[in-house]
C-alpha cells in the first residue's frame, strides 16, 4: 500500500511531462516591393505555429499566397488555381501590412509563394516556403 501513492506521483509526473507546452511560435517577416518578396525564401518547421508579418512597401497592391505542396501558379494565376491554394491574403495596399498566425503545413517540402496580381508572377514575385520536418 505504501507503494501506491509513490506510483501515482510518478505516473502523474510522467503525464504532466508528456503534456508539455507546445514549441515556440516561429516568426517570419516578409516585405513586398515592386516586384519581389524579401526574403524570397524562408524555412519553417512542419506542423508548428507560425506568425507571418507581411509589409507592402511597394507602390502598387500586392497579394501573399502560399500554394499547396507540388502545385504552382505557372506564369499567370488563373481562377482554377484557387483550388491549389494552401493559404492566401489578398489586396495588401501600398504601405499596408498584416500579421497572421496559423499552423504550418504538416508535409515537408517546398511550397511556392506568389503575388497573384496580374503580371506580378511574370515580373518575378515568386518566392519559396521551405517546410522542414520537426525535431
Regions found by a protein language model. Give the residues of each.
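C-terminal motif of bacterial Sec signal peptides marking the signal peptidase cleavage site
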Residues: 15-18
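Extracellular/periplasmic metallocenter environments
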Residues: 36, 87-135
